[in-house]
């Protein structure tokens, strides 16, 4: 059914969000008092530059009245906002208590509630969301014949096979429901999506219930004035997935697991657990377990019974744990234990994740690692993997400006016990000066054996790391180039500036580029 002003008002009122409807001097809570209340909206947007005739405009965030200058000439049908703008527009305004919640509900309704036509899986956690999401999509694609969509921090996929770079870990609600509708129209049956803490903080998934949710792990991240003021707030937002899913997959070793179980119990949500065990019977009890297997890589079990042994293309024990979570989620949405679809786990490749290159005495890993946990995990992995070759480790990294300020110290803490040298370089920033961020990071280095320097040009920083390896040709040097993955841009003063890409720089310097 098409969304009209009357239907929008009724929906918002049902969710206790509607304050009143205002058009000029008419203030009412009954849309029938206004002309055209039953005329359908033909478009919905939160960007005044995209208004066309019969559009419903959602005013969110730091919206300003000046954005509505001359808006009546565009054919705007109505707007939703926490403030009335009768002084600048003659169109009716749906005045609400929470504009972001309202936008999510109205967007879902405008696009015909596409979530009801999909089996939706939501994945949260500090580390592993992207990898787990790709694993689940691969299994569901194999199981359904390519009918699984994906929303991730790396790429979005709306047809099961075409991937486009994403802007946000979890899209704005309006964009999410628009993409869900496109996925449904493309014949998709499943949607796998990462769910960030910000998604709950700013109501991007308000009103959305996941058929299966996952809470992988938790550690401090995204703590800043514009994200989460405290770890408690970060964890609280993450925990909301527990109240908004039909079944929950939980990391058995997750910090605060008891609290998350209490949340699930309060919402009558069944919990399934997963874990990585060092050997059979050695680890926290879990329903789904990944075990090292000398012959194949990892043996995966469900309730103590083998699902199969798989050799994962993605290296590292942490990725085996992510695969166990993916198996648990796939089982939760109906993939049978013996399905050959699980073989798809072996061939998952994620752009910019654990990209591995070798040349002479050099090994390089390009990865999106960007906080304490991901940096430490990667550094620990390569140190152990190449321990018999006594490697030197050179880390090339920076940290984003204007947000997640805790990452600056976290990245250093995660790297310095493994690194011989840390080269600090450019990352994305809006207002903060990058040189100030890098000097701050340098100040967090407490390990006296770590050599550090600053090179603002990111490509030159990687070149310095390669030169360092050449200067120590008698030893293996491992280069960890982290933070940007395969992104072909760096945000400078809030604007995207072209960048060669970490992976491309490494391949160029290693002589691995194809002509």
Tell me what each language-model feature is:
Residues 1-19, 51-58, 62-64, 331-337, ...:
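ATP-dependent carboxylate-amine ligase
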Residues 9, 105-248, 252, 256-270:
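Phosphate-binding loop of NTP-binding sites
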Residues 71-75, 206-209, 241-246, 264-267, ...:
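Short, conserved loop/helix-junction motifs that constitute active-site signature segments
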Residues 51-52, 70-73, 83-92, 157-161, ...:
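Short loop/helix-cap segments at secondary-structure boundaries that form the rim of catalytic
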Residues 103-107, 136, 140, 183, ...:
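Buried hydrophobic packing segments
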Residues 54, 87-89, 212-364, 442-446:
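Acidic, Mg2+-coordinating active-site environments of NTP-dependent enzymes
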Residues 63, 79-87, 152-155, 253-255, ...:
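Short, polar loop motifs at secondary-structure junctions
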Residues 1-105, 109, 315, 504-515:
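N-terminal leader/targeting and accessory segments in enzymes
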């Amino acid at each position: 059914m098409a969304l009209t002003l009357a239907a929008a008002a009724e929906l918002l009122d049902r969710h206790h969000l509607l304050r009143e409807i205002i058009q000029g001097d008419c203030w009412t809570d009954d849309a029938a008092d206004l002309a055209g209340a039953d005329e359908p909206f033909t478009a919905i947007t939160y960007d005044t530059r995209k208004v066309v005739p019969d559009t419903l405009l959602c005013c969110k965030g730091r919206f300003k009245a000046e954005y509505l200058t001359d808006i009546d000439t565009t054919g705007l049908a109505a707007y939703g906002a926490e403030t009335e703008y009768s002084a600048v527009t003659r169109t009716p305004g749906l005045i609400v208590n929470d504009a972001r919640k309202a936008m999510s509900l109205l967007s879902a309704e405008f696009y015909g509630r596409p979530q009801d036509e999909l089996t939706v899986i939501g994945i949260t956690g500090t580390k592993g969301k992207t990898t787990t999401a790709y694993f689940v999509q691969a299994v569901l694609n194999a199981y359904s014949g390519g009918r699984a969509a994906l929303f991730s921090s790396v790429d979005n996929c709306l047809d099961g096979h075409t991937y486009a770079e994403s802007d946000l870990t979890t899209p704005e609600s309006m964009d999410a429901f628009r993409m869900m509708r496109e996925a449904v129209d493309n014949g998709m049956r499943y949607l796998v999506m990462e769910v960030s803490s910000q998604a709950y903080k700013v109501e991007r998934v308000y009103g959305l219930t996941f058929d299966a949710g996952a809470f992988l792990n938790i550690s401090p991240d995204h703590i800043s004035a514009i994200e989460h003021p405290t770890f408690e707030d970060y964890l609280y937002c993450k925990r909301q997935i527990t109240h908004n899913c039909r079944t929950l997959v939980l990391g058995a070793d997750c910090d605060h697991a008891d609290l998350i179980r209490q949340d699930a119990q309060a919402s009558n949500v069944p919990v399934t657990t997963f874990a990585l065990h060092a050997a059979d019977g050695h680890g926290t009890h879990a329903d789904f377990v990944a075990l090292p297997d000398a012959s194949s890589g990892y043996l995966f079990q469900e309730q103590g019974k083998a699902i199969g042994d798989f050799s994962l293309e993605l290296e590292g024990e942490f990725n085996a744990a992510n695969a166990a979570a993916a198996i648990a989620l796939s089982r939760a949405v109906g993939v049978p234990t013996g399905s050959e679809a699980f073989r798809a786990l072996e061939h998952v490749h994620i752009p910019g994740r654990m990209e591995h290159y070798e040349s002479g005495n050099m090994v390089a890993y390009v990865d999106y690692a960007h906080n304490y946990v991901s940096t430490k995990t990667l550094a620990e992995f390569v140190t152990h993997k190449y321990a018999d070759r006594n490697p030197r480790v050179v880390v090339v990294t920076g940290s984003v400006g204007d947000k997640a300020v805790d990452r600056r110290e976290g990245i250093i803490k995660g790297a310095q016990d493994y690194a011989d040298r840390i080269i600090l370089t450019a990352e994305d920033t809006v207002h903060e000066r990058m040189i100030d961020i890098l000097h701050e990071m340098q100040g967090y280095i407490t390990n006296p054996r770590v050599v550090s320097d600053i090179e603002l040009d990111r490509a030159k920083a990687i070149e310095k790391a390669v030169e360092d390896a050449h200067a120590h040709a008698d030893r293996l040097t491992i280069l960890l180039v982290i933070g940007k993955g395969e992104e072909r841009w760096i945000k400078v003063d809030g604007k995207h500036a072209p960048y060669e890409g970490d992976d491309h720089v490494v391949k160029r310097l290693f002589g691995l580029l194809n002509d």
